Design a protein with these regions (language model features):
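C-terminal segment of classical bacterial N-terminal signal peptides
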Residues: 2, 7-17
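A residue-level marker of the well-folded mature domains of exported/periplasmic proteins
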Residues: 19-368
């Protein structure tokens, strides 16, 4: 059900795609510098490819997923594993993502010019190579996190909600690592919150990785104990700790990258909604284009609300948890972002905020 919902949300074409001329199926490798089961980012990528295989059939498309692990001890095998798949020579495309794979992919793209790659969720530096064999897709997470920030700021002072203390205006943000993509989430979150409450305060913490849920829980518990009643986790598996902390504290936590309320039903009451980055759908789109010979290698594409690259889960659960007046305001903001009336500043791209501007924005909402 999740895979189908993801496919529908991006408007992915269901026009039949033909197998290759040699009769062999199109073959992809998905290399994860992490593991499945994160209920988030990597599960989204795997769900997208699984949905594509179910749609087209294994005689047309097949894929293998390699879980390389995310710990410090695992990092040493990421590049050798990538090279092993390149040496194999049987994959039409090798897929990997995140800033942690950038150096390895840059090396591989230069050493294997005939191997095609799809790189997601971090900007590829084409001045270092890859103009002919790397396709790059990123997401406008600042747009969807703007809505999350606005919703958090509206909910934190809503006296109709039992899990908030309306006497203060403190919300939380838990990041995995302090990189450009996580900063893009953060600056969108702050801008959205300030748009509805200029006096909002944001408790900010970084786990230092994307896998340590125990550390994530400890940090989130501290935020909740210090007055935050709504948090936003952008930390992969480590972010699951924030959701656990929200349950233990009787507070809220927004999900990320997948519909975490649906994936974690025991915790759903504490998860108003999730900010989804449609990784799986972007991979479906890219592979279908590649099968038709139309994927623009050497190009970076950004996907936001207008392109179907991000979304906010708005289902029956969302309608049950979030008051109608808040939902109405969020709908209006989303429409304004989509049509360009609201321009959300970003930590990424040609028009990115400077580091000084980002820090000034963070300082403007610092707790205490």
């Amino acid at each position: 059900a999740l895979s189908m919902a993801m496919a529908l949300s991006l408007g992915v074409s269901t026009v039949p795609v033909m197998a290759e001329d040699d009769g062999e199926p199109y073959k992809a490798a998905l290399l994860l510098n992490g593991t499945l089961g994160d209920k988030s980012f990597y599960d989204s990528a795997n769900a997208g490819l699984t949905a594509l295989q179910e749609e087209l059939g294994e005689d047309v498309f097949t894929f293998k997923v390699e879980q390389m692990g995310a710990t410090a001890a695992d990092e040493a095998k990421w590049e050798p594993t990538l090279y092993d798949y390149c040496d194999d020579g049987s994959y039409d495309v090798i897929i990997c993502g995140t800033f942690q794979m950038l150096a390895a992919l840059t090396n591989a793209a230069n050493d294997y010019p005939d191997q095609k790659f799809i790189y997601f969720d971090e900007m590829f530096d084409y001045t270092a190579g890859g103009e002919e064999n790397v396709y790059n897709v990123m997401y406008k997470q600042n747009e969807v996190s703007y809505l999350v920030g606005a919703m958090a700021a509206l909910m934190t002072t809503d006296d109709s909600l039992e899990m908030v203390d309306p006497s203060n205006s403190i919300i939380g943000f838990l990041g995995g690592m302090e990189n450009s993509v996580i900063k893009d989430f953060l600056v969108g979150y702050i801008q959205g919150a300030q748009a509805v409450n200029p006096d909002i305060q944001v408790a900010l913490a970084y786990v230092g990785n994307f896998y340590d849920s125990a550390a994530g829980k400890d940090m989130a518990l501290t935020q909740y104990q210090n007055g935050a009643d709504i948090g936003f986790n952008v930390a992969g598996s480590a972010g699951l700790g924030q959701i656990e902390a929200a349950v233990d504290s009787g507070r809220y936590a927004f999900g990320v990258d997948s519909d975490q309320a649906a994936l974690l039903p025991d915790y759903a009451a504490n998860i108003p909604t999730s900010a989804i980055k449609n990784v799986g759908n972007s991979l479906i789109r890219a592979i279908k284009l590649d099968m038709e010979g139309e994927l623009p290698y050497g190009t970076l594409e950004y996907m936001g609300f207008a392109e179907g690259g991000v979304e906010l889960v708005k289902d029956a659960h969302y309608e049950e948890v979030v008051p109608e007046d808040i939902r109405t305001q969020i709908d209006e903001m989303q429409e304004q972002i989509t049509n360009g009336e609201i321009e959300v500043q970003s930590a990424l791209g040609e028009n990115a905020m400077s580091e000084d501007e980002i820090q000034a924005l963070i300082d403007s909402v610092q707790v205490g």
